[in-house]
């Protein structure tokens, strides 16, 4: 969760909260100009983040928005229009604002790169999609070797994408590369940060699927080291251990549009880990339930497979997922640990794995999270719709 002032927290927690704001800025090299769009310019806006506690699926972080095109400024046939100056990977910076004591305070929302746009000749709106840096590693096949530590493999994969090491930052900087990489849009650097946990595990000369993309290689490294993948608000894409620090944040019923819904999944009886050369480890967890399977040839030894199985069980022991919708709080991030107020009590230890902020005249946030905490004494499925007006 992004840290803000006490005034921000106090203002947002009030039932009659001040107005929220969103701002998108994009530098256009052809024009040598930065285009800035605020809430008044947006017809619609969505910011969606998803992540997997097991790194079993690739994370996603993207924005979709539409702008007024009634004057034809985005028409492709307009010789003085803006569409001709668009190109893939233009850097778009997002920030969120909140009115406090008559002025707007801002916090970063993320860094994205233009991937799609649609500007019809006679349309009254132009729509755009921008995604995080990982998106540009999805269709680039990995051609290097799998040897050394997982850190070495991840570093090699990042290098193939054109990412250089900046030792002064301790991060990987995406820029011009002699390895056939690419530059993001305006030449601005994107950054990657790798956890030292990747240095604990070694892999040697593993045969892998030649169709595996750079993103998949990074995902396998994260999974084999018990790490998660996600992009931070400053544009840094991280592979690191999840610390599950409780933010002490509560999603209150007063600001919710619906009662939260709890989904119960079958408990885990054991975890089956398939590791290098097709070897298997069966890790018992409880007396009944289903078998959770994990297949990763980057897991090199039985000891490592045992650690991964323990990690899976510690994350998935609750087998409860919660979803809801409430008045937006743009401080919330992927993998934040929060509490959710329900009709019958407060559900604690909820790790957010899917969070979406939308604006179509007013802000809303929908969320999904995995319950790692004790939850409520009596778990109840609540499907009734809150009928009151939430401002």
Task: Name what the model sees in each region.
Residues 303-317:
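Stable alpha-helical structural segments in soluble proteins, enriched in small hydrophobic residues
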Residues 227-228, 309, 358:
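Short beta-strands and strand-coil junctions in structured, solvent-facing domains, enriched
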Residues 1-148, 156, 178, 182, ...:
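Assembly/oligomerization scaffold segments
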Residues 35, 52-58, 287-296, 302, ...:
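Short secondary-structure boundary/capping segments within folded domains
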Residues 31-32, 102, 234-235, 278, ...:
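Detector for glycine-centered tight turns/loop "hinges" at secondary-structure junctions
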Residues 228-231, 270-275:
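Broad, structure-driven detector of short, well-ordered beta-strand segments within folded domains
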Residues 103-106, 118-263:
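Charged- and aromatic-enriched interaction segments used to assemble
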Residues 1-13, 19, 128-130, 137-145, ...:
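Acidic, low-complexity/disordered segments
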